Swiss-Prot record:
Its main location: cytoplasm. This is Leucine--tRNA ligase. The keyword Nucleotide-binding applies. A motif ('KMSKS' region) lies at residues 579-583. ATP binds at residue 582. SUPFAM superfamilies: Anticodon-binding domain of a subclass of class I aminoacyl-tRNA synthetases, Nucleotidylyl transferase, ValRS/IleRS/LeuRS editing domain. One of its GO terms (molecular function) is leucine-tRNA ligase activity. Belongs to the class-I aminoacyl-tRNA synthetase family. The keyword Phosphoprotein does not apply. GO terms for biological process: leucyl-tRNA aminoacylation.
Length: 809
């Protein structure tokens, strides 16, 4: 009977579904595994990147389920967001309709691949119940001071007409639509992620060896902790009159280089610069260039060519008394430190680049024979008055102490990370649950009034926020004074939704109506044991999720410190050397692959083509090869003896049979390491192929039966449909359990030993593994007799199971 993928796959998907085979068990005393792949945005169809992500997660979920773990393997949809509004404009369809139609189609696609997701815990973040408890979290955070309002410069996308977080600006462009981003001053709500900066940084230690080093480094750099000196510099008298300021604050991490300062660089937003602008003391050219810098995002400023303009004013060095020129520069950020940076060109690459460009002084204060800039934090100080000849670290501490003693400076800790602006001027998002009252100010909604849902009778035009234009939706009564008020019309950044969905999944779905998180079940299931997703989320979703975990812990909802124990960042799927995209015309449709070859073939190719963390190059021939392997497996299984296993005795097997059995058990042994640790599924599949090839040379019915019993067990998480079909036919699926190794299989009958004379290999021989040391040495001498003739042996060395070395003279 030929292999018919479609019939087999539909049969088993129906059985699994009807028997709720993949739902987590209620017994919270069982050992658990929570396997989660990052949930998708419902764009309409899944792509091969999705297939790879969810196949990896599904393999692990199936494996742990098979060996007796209680497994939670959920899926949902990150369903709020701007693309739904763009689709509404383009296709004249309501964002909600577009979103839920896409969800329905993508669910069908996902389950056609045999993914073992829990259907009962499926959710969409645009569901009213999800919104209700997200709004509850917002209010609780607001009441605790973790969310506040302020007016600030924000990244504004003119195309999407909304605010973007710093992390959502890529090379000066919107991460979603690619449009230029400008700076705009607006009021908004901010999440105080900086309150957890120290803990977010410290707890990265707990994730070492469990998260990719690249992700840990990216988060560490984004948090950007720096310890240093904050100190005051007085302005000279003429500069005081111009700026209406007497001094300025400066932050530095290199107090040891303070005598090397040759200029002070200010952010364009610094009050001294703004005072000069307001008094028209800067020429029009400088004014125009400052405006250009102000419209750049922080990331764009950091990455662009260093530019600056002399302001015509000076500060006085607090120790040497020298005059230091003040410049405005594009690389200084207003909200990092004090918005003013002391520049030491001799010992900082950026400062050196700037000083060289504008012909500014370069003062060396650390002794070195190397070319400048010398940026190492080691060496003896020079040209630093009483601190000469001190090493950098000692000088740094003494200089800071002197500043503190004179009361002109202090030790401070700064972080690069900024509070997270979450207000978005769009319709398709979770409404911010706040009220604006002319009497009471900003007031939270009452919890019993949640969820605050979106009106459906809106016009999506792409111009401004539809909620602002709705004739009645904003109108409400202030819960504090009872007077007429207005609802907040901004909606939440969609990263707010994806920052806690993993905890909602961990909560028993039977409690979803009543509470955000069920204490008992989240305590059992959290943290996620294995999280899987793209590295592009390293400083977006992954950092926000870590913050949310800690904030919800402190609000009493959760108990764990970290949301994800282990993280795997899978590589991209490429075709013709490039990421798949419609514009490049290199997209492979998963539906077409499933229809032609079946889901198991798609899964096998995805896992065999490359290790999960590496990029995967799509190859049509390799897909054909995966299909042929499954057909061959299916065909060979038709000749395997059915029923109970016949016990095999190792001593009764011939050499070829022992070798084939060894290869089967080596594959089983490898499966333990691959499924538990390395995830090198390609090597495991190769080991199974090698075992089957060795088995083909044998004519032992009992051996073939045992081999299929084991190999179908190993491959079931990878190609589940065909393995269930064959295992049911041959073994009534009794092989789907935790299997044990048989040590006697690994005991070799013979040893292959090398013989060296004076360290140089001269011969090899095979001998019984039961031979004594004396027998082995005698055999070694016999095999090297011609090199020993006329020589005397002064030493005999036997490295057990490996080699013999004879020392002669």
């Amino acid at each position: 009977m030929a292999y018919e993928a479609s019939l087999i796959e539909k049969k088993w998907q129906k059985i699994w579904d009807e028997n709720e085979y993949f739902e987590p068990k209620d017994d919270l005393n069982l050992p658990k595994k929570y396997i989660l792949s990052m949930f998708p945005y419902p764009s309409g169809r899944i792509h091969m990147g999705h297939v790879r992500n969810y196949t990896i997660g599904d393999v692990l979920a199936r494996y742990y389920r098979k060996i007796g773990f209680n497994v939670l393997h959920p899926i949902g949809f990150d369903s709020f967001g701007m693309p739904a509004e763009n689709a509404a404009i383009k296709h004249k369809i309501h964002p909600k309709s577009w979103t839920y139609e896409n969800i329905a189609y993508m669910k069908k696609e996902l389950f056609s691949l045999g993914f073992s997701f829990s259907k009962k815990r499926m959710l969409a973040t645009s569901d009213p119940l999800y919104t209700k408890f997200e709004q509850e979290f917002f209010i609780k955070m607001f009441e605790k001071g973790l969310i506040y309002t302020k007016e600030a410069n924000v990244n504004w996308c003119e195309q999407d007409q909304t605010v973007l977080a710093n992390e959502q600006v890529e090379d000066g462009k919107c991460w979603r639509c690619g449009h230029e981003v400008v700076q705009k001053k607006m009021p908004g709500y901010y999440v105080k992620i900086t309150a957890y900066a120290e803990e977010l940084l410290k707890d990265l230690e707990e994730l070492k060896d469990k998260w990719p080093n690249q992700v840990l480094t990216m988060q560490e750099n984004w948090i950007g902790k720096s310890e240093g000196l904050e100190f005051s510099l007085n302005l000279d008298e003429e500069s005081k009159q111009k700026t209406k300021e007497s001094s300025l604050e400066v932050f530095t991490t290199r107090a040891d280089t303070i005598y090397g300062v040759s200029y002070i660089a200010l952010a364009p937003e610094h009050k001294i610069v703004q005072n000069l602008l307001s008094q028209n003391l800067l020429n029009q050219d400088v004014l125009n260039k400052i405006k250009v810098i102000q419209n750049q995002s922080p990331r764009e400023r950091q990455s662009s060519e260093k530019e600056g303009y002399f302001l015509g004013i000076y500060a006085i060095h607090p120790l040497s008394g020298e005059k230091i020129p003040l410049w405005v520069a594009n690389f200084v950020l207003a909200d990092y430190g004090s918005g003013a940076v002391m520049a030491v060109p001799a010992h900082d690459e950026r400062d050196f680049e700037f000083a060289t460009k504008y012909n500014l002084a370069i003062k060396q204060v650390i002794q070195t024979q190397e070319n400048l800039p010398y940026t190492q934090k080691s060496g003896k100080l020079i040209h630093s008055q009483e601190f000469d000849n001190l090493d950098c670290n000692e000088a740094r501490l003494k200089i800071i102490s002197q500043f503190e003693a004179k009361n002109i400076g202090k030790r401070v800790v700064n972080f690069k990370i900024r509070d997270w602006g979450v207000s978005r001027q769009r319709y398709w998002g979770a409404p911010i649950p706040m009220i604006k009252c002319q009497i009471c100010g900003i007031v939270p909604q009452k919890l019993e009034n949640l969820p605050i849902t979106l009106p459906e009778d809106v016009q999506i035009t792409g111009e401004g926020n539809p909620l602002d234009k709705h004739p009645t939706w904003k109108n409400c009564i202030c819960p504090k004074c009872g007077k007429e008020a207005q609802k907040e019309s901004d909606t939440l950044d969609t990263f707010f939704e994806s920052s806690w969905y993993f905890a909602r999944f961990a909560s028993d779905e039977k409690t979803w109506q009543e509470k955000a998180l069920d204490e008992k079940s989240v305590k059992y299931w959290m943290s996620v044991d294995q999280y899987i997703g793209g590295i592009e989320h390293a400083i977006l979703h992954l950092l926000y999720a870590r913050f949310f975990q800690k904030a919800l812990r402190d609000l009493g909802y959760l108990t764990q410190n970290e949301p994800f124990d282990r993280l795997l960042t899978q590589g991209m799927v490429l075709k013709d050397g490039a990421k798949m995209s419609k514009s490049k015309g290199n997209v492979v449709d998963p539906d077409e692959i499933i229809e032609k070859y079946g889901a198991d073939t798609a899964r096998l190719f995805i896992l065999f083509a490359a290790p999960p963390a590496k990029e995967l190059e799509w190859n049509d021939d390799a897909v054909e090869g995966a299909y042929r392997f499954i057909c061959k497996l299916y065909d060979r299984a038709q000749n395997v003896k059915k029923g109970e296993l016949v016990e095999l005795k190792q001593e009764n097997l011939n050499k070829e049979e022992k070798y084939a059995r060894l290869k089967v058990y080596e594959a089983l042994k490898k499966s333990f390491e691959v499924y538990h640790q390395s995830f090198a599924f390609n090597t495991l599949i190769a080991a199974c192929m090698e075992a089957l090839n060795a088995l083909a040379l044998c004519k032992n019915e009992a051996l073939e039966q045992e081999a299929f019993y084991i190999i179908l067990n190993i491959l079931e998480p990878i190609i589940p449909h065909v393995c269930f079909e064959l295992s049911e036919e041959l073994f009534k699926c009794k092989n789907f359990k935790k299997l044990e190794l048989k040590e006697e299989v690994f005991v070799k009958d013979t040893l292959n030993l090398a013989v060296s004379i004076n360290g140089k290999k001269r011969a090899e021989f095979e001998i019984s593994s039961s031979a004594s040391k004396e027998e082995i040495l005698a055999f070694a001498k016999e095999n090297t007799a011609k090199w020993l003739e006329g020589k005397s042996i002064v030493k005999e060395i036997y490295v057990e199971g490996k080699l013999v070395n004879l020392v002669i003279k």
